[in-house]
Structures are given as structure tokens and as C-alpha cells.
């Protein structure tokens, strides 16, 4: 029974982590609520926060409701929002109805999607969220998290304890240690299966890459901040505490978009570049032929 529950939980968490991302969209995140209102956050294509606010659209009526709707209207038009992520918790249906109505008013095409709020409150009150968004209230951090979940579920959900994401009704019937180990393994498998962009990946995402612990992940972010974007995988060797063995383990999972060598943006490990180039040559292709293609 325990094995069956573990397998079910692993499948559930894997499905959530591997949900398709929504790329190149400016997204409005809505964390629904009644008394405290709906918390709002607009993020750009990279997840950077552009705007925040609160709108009491679920309890207001008449002229008051129109004023609250205007808060969202202005955000949508000011930032040319093309996608809205609505949390599925309290007041979700009422918020959904208002958002759907407002999107129809826009002079351009836009859509909304209801996303799982599971773990958003846990993340927003965490030390990690406080370090990432010290200038924002806890409730607004939840709205940011909801918006980013639509953009890139994997990158956002790795910041949260897997058990807080919601992994099935039997998760509390299993030994906590076994469940935690199994779910952590699934998270690591998913991150390494997809790979991450070395120049945009957060500390949380990097720390799940094979060969990279939390110290090295912080050092990568620090190096990136101090020296600018990585231009190739070889630069990883300059990161503090990232030795030859760690490089051997992690290099194949880290992508460098726009690198001079297109293979740096693929799952091909540096030690196999020679073989990859030979295969391309024998098939009548050059490295330049794969440049610019999405290999993530």
C-alpha cells in the first residue's frame, strides 16, 4: 500500500512540475479573496514584477464595483497583458467571471487560466520569498507566484516543499521521511530532464541540478551578477567551489542561449562535443545549422 501511495504521489507531483510553460507572455497573476480583496501582480516575459495592486471585485457592487474593475482594466492596458493566471482558491469563480468580462473589452486578444494555488501561501511566507521580494507584502508575493506558475511551472514550484504542492489524498498516510525522499527525487529528475538556462535560472532551480549544491548555486548567481551573463559553459569553471567533478556532473543540464558554440544550448555534454560535430559533419550539416533552434 505504501509503495502504491508513493507511486501515486510521484506521478502527481511530476505532472504538476512538467506542465507546459507559457513563454513570451506578460501575465497578470490574481490571488482571489473576499474581505481582503484580490491581490494582483503583473510580471513580464522573464518573470520580473512590473506592477502590483489590490481590487475588491468579489464583494463590491454598482459604482463601487466599477471602480474596482478599473484597477484591473488599467493594469491590463498599461502593460498590454495577454494572459491572466487566476488562483483556484477562495473566491476563484467570482474573480474568474469578472476577469473574463474585462478581457472581452480589450482591443487585442488575451486569455485567462485558473491555476493551482497549492503551496503559494507557504512560499509567500518563506525566507526565500522574503529574500526575493523584500519590498512586497506576503499577500502580493502569492499573486506573483501564481503569475509565474503559468509562465514556467517548474521554475516556480521548485521553490516550494513538494509536500505543500499537493500530491494526492493519501500523502499523510505515508512515512514522512520516505515521502520526502521520493518527492525530492522526482523534483530533481524533472529539473535535470528539462535542463535550465544558466543565465536566467534562480538559485532554487540551480540547486536541483546534479552536482550543484546550495553553496555552488549561490556562487553561480553571484558570479552572474558580478560578471554579467555567461557566454559559454567553460565559464562555469571560474565559479567558486565548482570543481572538475561538479562541472562534469552539471554541465550537460545547463544551457547557455546565444553562446558562440550552439552545442552549449543543448543537452550534449562538453565531453561529447567532438562526437556531436563529427555526426553533424557526416550527415552533411554544420554547427551553424543548429544555431537559433530551441533545444531546451
Model-identified regions with their sequence ranges:
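Accessory alpha-helical DNA-binding modules that contact the DNA backbone or grooves
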Residues: 51, 193-296
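Single conserved hydrophobic/aromatic residue that forms the stacking wall/gate
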Residues: 1-8
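Hydrophobic positions on the alpha-helical face of helix-turn-helix-like DNA-binding modules
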Residues: 2, 84, 220
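Charge-patterned, long linear interaction tracts outside catalytic cores
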Residues: 152-223
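A short, structure-level motif marking secondary-structure boundaries and short turns
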Residues: 56-57, 131-132, 186-189, 217-219, ...
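Phosphate- and other anionic-substrate recognition elements at nucleic-acid/protein interfaces
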Residues: 9, 14-17, 23-30, 35-184
Amino acid at each position: 500500500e505504501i509503495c502504491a501511495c508513493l507511486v501515486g504521489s510521484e506521478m502527481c507531483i511530476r505532472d504538476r512540475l512538467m506542465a507546459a510553460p507559457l513563454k513570451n507572455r506578460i501575465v497578470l497573476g490574481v490571488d482571489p479573496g473576499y474581505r481582503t480583496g484580490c491581490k494582483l501582480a503583473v510580471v513580464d516575459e522573464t518573470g520580473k514584477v512590473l506592477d502590483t495592486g489590490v481590487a475588491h471585485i468579489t464583494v463590491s457592487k454598482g459604482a463601487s464595483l466599477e471602480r474596482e474593475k478599473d484597477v484591473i482594466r488599467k493594469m491590463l492596458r498599461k502593460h498590454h497583458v495577454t494572459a491572466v493566471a487566476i488562483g483556484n482558491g477562495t473566491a476563484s469563480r467570482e474573480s474568474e467571471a469578472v476577469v473574463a468580462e474585462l478581457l472581452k473589452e480589450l482591443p487585442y486578444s488575451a486569455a485567462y487560466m485558473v491555476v493551482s494555488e497549492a503551496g503559494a501561501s507557504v512560499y509567500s511566507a518563506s525566507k526565500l520569498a522574503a529574500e526575493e521580494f523584500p519590498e512586497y507584502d506576503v499577500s502580493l508575493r502569492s499573486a506573483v507566484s501564481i503569475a509565474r506558475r503559468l509562465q514556467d511551472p517548474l521554475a516556480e514550484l521548485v521553490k516550494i516543499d513538494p509536500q505543500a504542492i499537493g500530491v494526492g489524498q493519501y500523502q499523510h498516510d505515508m512515512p514522512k521521511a520516505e515521502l520526502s525522499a521520493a518527492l525530492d527525487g522526482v523534483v530533481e529528475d524533472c529539473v535535470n530532464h528539462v535542463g535550465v538556462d544558466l543565465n536566467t535560472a534562480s538559485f532554487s532551480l540551480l540547486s536541483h541540478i546534479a552536482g550543484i549544491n546550495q553553496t555552488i548555486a549561490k556562487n553561480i548567481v553571484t558570479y552572474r551578477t558580478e560578471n554579467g551573463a555567461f557566454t559559454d559553459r567553460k565559464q562555469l569553471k571560474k565559479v567558486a567551489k565548482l570543481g572538475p567533478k561538479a562541472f562534469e556532473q552539471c554541465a550537460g543540464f545547463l544551457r547557455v542561449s546565444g553562446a558562440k558554440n550552439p552545442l552549449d544550448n543543448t543537452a550534449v555534454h562538453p565531453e561529447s562535443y567532438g562526437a556531436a560535430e563529427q555526426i553533424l559533419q557526416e550527415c552533411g550539416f554544420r554547427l551553424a545549422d543548429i544555431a537559433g533552434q530551441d533545444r531546451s
